[in-house]
Amino acid sequence: MIGLFAAFLLQAASVAPPPADPPVVRIKPSKIILVGDSTMQVNSGWGGSFCATRVTSFAACVDLGRGGRSTKSYRAEGSWDIALNEMKTPGYVHVYVLIQFGHNDQPGKPGRSTDLATEFPANLRRYVTEARAAGAIPILLTPLTRRYFKDGQITRDLDPWADAVRAVAKEMKVPLVDLNARSAAIIQAMGPVLAGHYSLGLPDAAMVGSALAGNSGEKPPAPPAAPAAPAPAPAASALPKVGMRGDGFDYTHLNRDGADLFAGVVANELALVLPEMRPILIP
């Protein structure tokens, strides 16, 4: 009996201790910051879909796109200061800043329009310089095309602004995602009818008829309507106002399908022009 007990103790002593936990390898996270207008912001642009579906869990993605903003007004209102603070947040190995403007820098937008030859490129250069000074990697994007058609051909009304972005990217050696060229080629191949399926809201019958004839971008004039009785004033609400989503149909902004489409385009282009980003992208 004593011999069996001694054998048991000897066997127990010879059992190897459990293996130690492997050393913890700390992650090396990156951050992607989106800076731009409504064609990039959530619910009307591609940015929300990009952050939600095209970035891995090893990168934070912050969409700071703001509807109606230009290179001038985005800075003037303080949105760029918010972006700079995001760039300076510690803990990230790489911080990438995607900058896309052009739509609201065009003429006819008081407080937002910029001079194409001087002010617009100067504003872009300043964004690039300050992003680099904050330790971030700026990436310029040409503006998403509008889906205007005339006689079956897409109207390239943003080409001069896209050219200016390309010139600044070349001059300052900034990675460039030529979203304008890529989106214009895609929309041209679709044609006005199919391209309309990527818009917020729904077109009316006149707009559908115009698209079938190869045209889009301007709503045909409606016949004069009989004056309607004034609607009663809505009762005041104690609830705070909520943000506007903007469901009106147009040929600039994107619904969910459109956002998904062009988020994929941006992810693929980023993987090509900046291969170091591939591990954090889902093309």
Language-model features, listed with the residues they occupy:
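Bacterial N-terminal signal peptides
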Residues: 2-12
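Solvent-exposed, well-ordered amphipathic alpha-helical segments
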Residues: 10-11, 27, 267
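Hydrophobic residues within membrane-embedded alpha helices
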Residues: 12-13, 132
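Serine-esterase "nucleophile elbow" of acetyl-processing enzymes
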Residues: 14-73, 80-93, 97
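Residue-level recognition of conserved structural "scaffold" positions that shape functional pockets
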Residues: 43, 72-75, 109, 265
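Phosphate/oxyanion-binding active-site loops and adjacent basic polyanion-contact surfaces
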Residues: 75-76, 259
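Alpha-helical cap/lid subdomain in secreted, periplasmic
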Residues: 81-283
